[in-house]
């Protein structure tokens, strides 16, 4: 369990660095801003790509759960 927690923390730190670089914003201690920026990044990512099959199911699931 501890290793998965470390992995998650490392993964989130990496995503945060990437998001701060892309958005030029500092939101390391603000979960709402972080989630909004991540949602915007996902939204742009899905708009750029031509999603079919399982990717469309994933997008529909994210929209249904109000992540996008």
From Swiss-Prot:
Further remarks about this protein from its record? Phi KhT, a host-range mutant of phi K, can grow on E.coli C and B, besides K12, and is more thermosensitive than the parental phage phi K.
Origin organism is: Enterobacteria phage phiK (Bacteriophage phi-K)
Gene Ontology biological-process entries: viral DNA genome packaging
Role noted for this protein? C protein is one of the proteins involved in the production and packaging of viral single-stranded DNA.
What is the protein's name according to its record? C protein
Pfam families to which the protein is assigned, alphabetical: Phage_C (PF12025)
């Amino acid at each position: 369990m501890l290793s998965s927690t470390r992995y998650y923390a490392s993964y989130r730190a990496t995503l945060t660095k990437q998001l701060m670089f892309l958005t030029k914003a500092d939101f390391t201690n603000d979960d709402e801003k972080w989630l909004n920026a991540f949602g915007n990044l996902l939204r742009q990512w899905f708009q750029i790509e031509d999603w079919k099959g399982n990717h469309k199911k994933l997008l529909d699931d994210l929209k249904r759960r109000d992540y996008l």
